[in-house]
Amino acid sequence: MKKVGTGQKRNRSIFRFSTLAFAIHAVSMGGLVVLPMQQAYAQTAGVKSYNIPAGRLANVLNQFAEQSGTSIAMDAQQLQGLHSLGLKGNFAVEQGFEQLLKSTEFNAVKVGQGYTLSKKSTPRVISSKVQATSLPPSSAVIEEDASVRLTPIVVYGKEDRDTEGYNKVYDANRSSVYAGKDYVERFKGTNPADVLQGMVGVYSGDARNSGALDPSVRGVQGVGRVPLTIDGTEQSIAVWRGYNGVNNRNYIDPNLIAGIEVIKGPSLERNTTTSVGGAVVVKTLEADDIVRPGKSFGAELKVEGSTNSIDPSLPDMSKVGQNYDDTTPWIDMNGSKYDPDIYKKNRTRSDNSHFSGDDLAGRLAIATKQDKFDLLAVYAVRERGNYFSGTHGAGYYKRATPDSSLDFIPYFAYAYQPGDEVPNTSSHMESWLLKGTYRPTDDQTLKLTYRDTKNIFGEIMPSRIVWGITPDLGVPQWPLSNIHSKAYSLEYKFKPENNRWIDFYANIWQTDTESQTYTRGGWPTTIDFRDNTIINTAISHSDNTRKGITVSNKTRLLDQLDLTLGGSFLKEKLTSDDVYGEFGPSYSLYQALPRAGRREEKTFDFNFNYRPVSWLSFDAGMRYRSYWAIDDFLNKSLQSEIDPSLNPLFTKKSRLKEYTFEYQTMPESYTSTQQRLINVLKQRYATKNPEWDGQLDTVPASESTLYNMIWSQKNTLSWKADANGQLSLADNPLNQLNASGQKYVVTGGNFMSVVDQVPVESADKVKDSGWAPQLGASIHLTPNSRIYARYAEEYRLPSLFESTVGFSAMLQYQAIKPEHAFNYEVGYVYDMRDWFSTARNADIKLAYYYNKTKNVIERDQNLIFTNMDEQKLSGLELQSRFDNGGFFTDLSVAYNLKNEVCDTNSAINKMILGGTVQTEQGLEFREPYQRCVDDGFPNGYLVTMATPELSFHGLLGARFFDEKLELGARATFYKAYESPLRKNNDASVNKGYYLNVPLAWDDTWIFDAYARYQVDDYNTVEFVGSNLSNQFYIDPLTRSAMAAPGRTMKISWTTKF
């Protein structure tokens, strides 16, 4: 059958009817199958205004079905070569079909809730009472002069998955972005995180050094803030990055993706897990993606190969456990030893063979669609070596030599030479996807899904790159990490026809993730000098299991009022078989504590949708969340199963008691000895400085002996904290000192902290809960334009990562509160198809958002989890698209207006750590008090989550030869970024990007292009070029200074049979 409409047409869907199913519908409708449409139907259908341009008859009928809100089944082959003059004016549905088909041999016949296209026949009606404008009475006998043979058909009108996803961006009263199956497969790139490129306002943290996605939406990122679900299942693991913070990893195989929707901000959307930042909703392949229209069985084979790859030169880990003296001598540099099997010169651009065969992928899918059931089986594999970086635009990253700066970025290109291999970037991914759908009745659906993915990939702890030696030894190549993830889900839908009370959905699911990753903090090979044994202190093992239930029901209370009820339950368990302290205290300090704990979360929500008139709608609802969590590792530690001397920080809580500050004054009187010595020193100073006025308080500090004798009375100021270790600006002791009028000097100028170590006596269960409302309204200003506004609150309850002791942060004294987000958004949407007579899509959307999150969970400057007062984010987003079949484009721009973090306690601590300075007004802090700072405070996580101030994504293309050939190009721009901590030369920040200071990047343009050709109904070939300008760059939000892939060419072949 001819493929109809390869472009993305608005409001069009393709789903299949088997011949048997269609025949059953036809028989059930009796004589309606062969009779022309009559006015009786027109009386029940609304009249609408249409302006459909001339074109191929199949396309015109499709557009009419879309705009009228119905569906029509047709055999596209029967319409080949037929054209239509279009439709303009006011018509009911039946009148419109009659007008479009009046000069053809076809008519449209109503079948159930839709229509089917049938050849016209001349019925003989044996009754003198039948009128031309009415249906025949039941006594009439109808005979056909000719019968119509039913052929495989395609039903148009109802949207398919991808069309619905793209349209929802402009139809929903909220912000989102969508990528369909073709787009994901075309631009899936080198790393899994590449599937998010091109989505406005959406990024992934540490894209090149994680093998996973760490979603960021409108600057909101982190564990639990932007949940990622795959077919309704959730899997997320927090991973330590040493001095460079934490990753929120979501492992996914791009070869299984059928569509990605990113929802921006909290939402009460049905059967969707969102949080304070929104959600990433991933759907995997279905039988509809594989079985050809009108067929019952189908298979798809996809193979592809890419350039710019080379097999990694992996170290031999069999030496672990051997005596160092029995191995190849290690490299001795600057008093340290380096394993030559790990530290080796990286391959150069001359080793980059364009057709090496080191990046190959394939996918085989087999499916069947029957009346009662569907089955799908998919196997996908991709093996890719290390990639090579680009060569152009490296000047920004080559502004200093390694021995002249502790700032990584200015000499980044010395470590990663442009065009050279980037170690630790390889991947071997293998997946299975099995789905079975059973339809016991027309009202019920039961779907069972199983997904299994093995991912063996390269990564390195960012702080182990050892920047000072990489130009000489090369970037170390570590062994590969290993992830095995499984997911199971059972979905049930029940939607009785003509029942306004029941539209029920339930999903029971589980994910299991086994991790063996090089994220523990040590080294893959190091020497245990107690016995000279080579040991591996970098590998970490963990198991994460999540079990969940999601249920919802939608009820139509009135014709204008819907109520949706929903609820969910999540149970999570994290375990590890790592033995903390197995190599003694000298190594345990470099290793992460093995987190272990349990957590449960429950939600309940309701949402009303009210449509009082056709141009106005309202949404109002609330969500309740509750949780509890318990730290199993801490509990085990407190039972004396782990020696606390290895790391006492996890058995004690730190609480700031006070800051003390010393200053000196003149004593009320000097001792006789002091007075004699001062007199002698005064005389000497006066002799050398005849202009001296003789006053002791004007003796400069350079006369240190006399100066110290004069100011010999030591005094102490104290800035006391409250019972929870929090400081108040009103208690600033310098204000009191300056107001006293007392003469004093300061020789040190630094405040000293006094911290109480409070023993942890028990690992108690922590819990919390909260209700959050959401409101929205939309107004259609014209039939083609509307405005909307929404207000959404949301709670994010502390994650298991924030509820357990382990890597990256110490135990907090005060219990962590839930984050509470307040999100505001207004938007304007305009459908411009009236401007373009041949447009399938022509939309523009402008949105403004302002998000404030109170009690945002963060790591403070003392590396302790705490609640910041608030974070404020705001920005503008523009999205647009156009498609007329021959030409299409999709353009989007994001401009961030504000990213501000506010916290009184952090601001005071930052001010104190900056030191003091003497001024004419007295003693003052060198840095002024600043409650709100851009991006975040030093040593925290938020400061590394800043996104580009300005970004642009553009896609444009054209179709030729009856849309068999498609050519397209994509451009992506990120504005340069440098953290305010760097720009302001913050004295409290350690040089060299220590303790989570974000990396900078230059203005970045990335250009991609593709050519897709449909050889015949069964075969498609596609060429894709990524980073065509061969740019040398790093990705935004990266925590690991690793160059991105250079120019890469991919060819793929897909066949369906």
Curated annotation (Swiss-Prot):
Statement: the UniProt record of this protein carries the keyword Phosphoprotein: no
Single annotated GO MF: siderophore uptake transmembrane transporter activity
Residue ranges annotated for the TBDR plug domain, each copy included: 168-285
Membrane topology annotation: Multi-pass membrane protein
Coiled coil: none
Name of one Pfam family that matches: TonB_dep_Rec_b-barrel
Highest rank taxon of the organism: Bacteria
Knocked-out gene: effects: In a mouse pulmonary infection model, the mutant exhibits reduced bacterial lung burden, and is virtually undetectable in the spleen and blood. In a systemic challenge, the mutant is avirulent.
GO CC, one annotated term: cell outer membrane
Induction: Part of the hemO gene cluster.
Family as reported in the entry's similarity comment: Belongs to the TonB-dependent receptor family.
Function text: Part of a high affinity heme acquisition system. Functions as a gateway for heme entry into the bacterial cell, enabling growth on hemoprotein sources. Can acquire heme directly from hemoprotein reservoirs, however, HphA likely enhances the efficiency of this process by delivering heme to HphR. Is essential for virulence, bacterial dissemination and growth in the blood.
Protein name: Hemophilin receptor
Organism in which the protein naturally occurs: Acinetobacter baumannii
Organism classification: Bacteria, Pseudomonadati, Pseudomonadota, Gammaproteobacteria, Moraxellales
